[in-house]
Amino acid sequence: MKLIRFLAVLLCTGLLCGCEMSSLPVGNESAEPPEAVSVDMSFAENTSDMFTDRDHETEFDTKDCVHIQLSGDTASSDSSAVDIEGSIITLTQDTSYYVTGKLNNGTIVVNPPDTAKLQIIFDGVEIHSETSAAFYILSGDKVFLTLAEGSENHLSSGKSFVSADDTNIDGTIFSKQDLTINGEGKLTVESPAGHGIVSKDDLVLTGGIYQITAASHGLSANDSIRISGSTLTVIAGKDGIQADNDEDTEKGFVYLESGTYDIKAQGDGISASNYLQIIGGDYKITAGGGAGASASSESMKGLKASGSMALSGGTFYIDSADDGVHSNTSIVVSGGEFTLSTGDDGFHAD
């Protein structure tokens, strides 16, 4: 076990990259200057396009919304923009929806036109789905899920998932499109058989309080995960936060800006198949059971990026069975405070 305390604000910029250690010169022996290392950090230069203005928009007027009242085994609505078949509630139009109530064993399916950018407000929603996602986004250009201020919302799934058509649904919240979750409410997600929140495109969080418990990944996305100003507590059987895309080299990244993150993951705390960028925030991460856990073939790192990593500010408490901070290429640290307890390296870059 290694315990490392590192105050990065003492550095203007710290660059870690893999290298071999050669013998040091002694006496008057001259030494060749080290070879310059070129690192592509262009991804960190402009972050203004990480969030759109609408990602942060949380206002709504219930008078302008389609109302849906969940009630036990079914729901009710007086709008033709909602199809109700037993416990399957389908939202079909490009409009705003206001949802309240409890659904015992069913699913809200979002299936509007492909160009739709619709807002769905949860205000005291509780949904359990025994064999599918509790909230399933099938179509649309982008969906904005707003947690009403002061509301508590609870989504859960059962012990197995059944595929829908050709879709392998494996999360309590499952989106085939871009998904933004915002607002000032609370969302609890329980997934005993899969992931907590899944997006096959971008997953964006710009506010809210999240309590996520999942047998697999807590948050998972193909294209990117972008989070700002949110409070997350994640307990995951695999990675806490994971973006993974092996088809497009520009995707599969994680961007975190401010917020509070408490992650207990049996795999990696935060993992990106591309780059990982963090600007501020408070992070408490336990990966793989912590530094005292037995070694495993599974990756159990605190922060991991297959591409480059840029850390600028923030407070990090990382307890990991493997490396605390790991990149397959390079790590740039330009601020932050780190307390690392690791079973392997504190900082490691290949």
Ranges and model annotations:
Residues 5-15, 19-350:
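A composition-driven surface/loop motif
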